[in-house]
Amino acid sequence: MRTILRGVTFGGSLLLLASVPASAQRSSVATGGSPAGWLAGCWALEGNGRIVEESWMPARGGVMLGMSRTTKGDRVTEHEFVLLRAVGSILEYRVRTGDQPEVVFRATAPSASEAVFENPTHDFPKRVGYRLVSADSLEAWIDGGAEGKGPKIGYGYHRVDCAKR
């Protein structure tokens, strides 16, 4: 199974948790707080004849929900759904791409401007990462893990008006 994840269905929603203790991260997410409110809304990238759109709901009930679609012309070529939540002191990024089974990634060491989620047993990608560039710009990437196996694929997103997408 070669699942390729894109974009901010890159739950970068955990990027701002870095300076917050794990116990505060749990309670913030569990009570519906938004530790990364900047991610809520819509992000997009366009190029190579395709459009990738990401939409994120603010945290409620202990989770943030995200979804993505990639279109080429009038055809949806890829889609995915993400659930972001704290399980104990671990931040989980649960993603379902197309008709593939759900894959769970766990945050390794989020900081104030970057988060990396990892699943060393998954075929590809093994890591999903995000870096906040500015309030309206986000870089996301996937790769084959710390060992450098497999390609590193990057995505540059800009914030867009959800109503106009």
State what each model feature region is.
Residues 53, 127, 154:
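Short hydrophobic/aromatic beta-strand element in the GNAT-like acyltransferase core
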Residues 117-119, 123, 128-132, 140-143:
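Well-ordered alpha/beta subsegment
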Residues 20-24:
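Sec/Tat signal peptide C-region and signal peptidase I cleavage site
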Residues 25-26, 102-107, 112, 137-139, ...:
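Edge beta-strand at a domain terminus
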Residues 8-19:
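Bacterial N-terminal signal peptides
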